[in-house]
Amino acid sequence: MRWSPDARGRLERAAFELFAEQGYQATTVPQITARAGLTTRTFFRYFADKREVIFAGDEIPDLARAAIEGAPAGIDPLDIVVHGLRTVADDRFEGRHDEVGSVRRLVLSESSLRERDARKRADLTDAVREAFVNRGLDPSEAAVIAETTVMLFHLALDAWLTGPAERRMADVVDEQLGALRGVLDRRPAAS
């Protein structure tokens, strides 16, 4: 078969169409490649397996690490987190509400995909924690900020996906952060 432009994109579109039509489990790699008009060999140049079609290209942990480590000295860790979450929301999710929602529903429908998603969350948490430790933050504080960052990201993602498509995810990040600050502001004073 001759070289075809945008092979990766064609494979992704074909896979998601088939997942929607017949389900994730029932879809095979040969079906995906036939739909895309490509060979199975081409598929495996881009993806290790069909699961990786969903999770491939996920460089968010590397982006998070670079953003945190590259932030100017003296900036409050929470300000770094907020800026990072807003940036990811705008760069990765804006204008993709329906597409992201379809992927999220697919992930939640399959136990093997939920496991991979949990691994992704852990990888992101580790990347954020390590980056803050590299900035000189105490390891226990870095762990708290990392867990909080990933929790806020996923709460915002879920709230955004269940709301109207016109809402900006960055605005939902701000709402979730406001909710967290409201809870923390109500904490009893230390005795």
Locate each region found by the language model.
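Hydrophobic alpha-helical connector segments
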Residues: 63-103
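Amphipathic alpha-helical packing segments from all-alpha helical-bundle domains
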Residues: 110-135, 143-147
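Polytopic alpha-helical membrane proteins, predominantly small-molecule transporters/carriers
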Residues: 15, 101-102, 109
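Alpha-helical DNA-contacting segments of helix-turn-helix folds
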Residues: 47, 51-62
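Basic, helix-initiating cap at the start of DNA-binding domains
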Residues: 1-22, 26-38, 55, 63, ...
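Hydrophobic/aromatic-rich alpha-helical bundle segments in the mid-to-C-terminal region
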Residues: 135-178
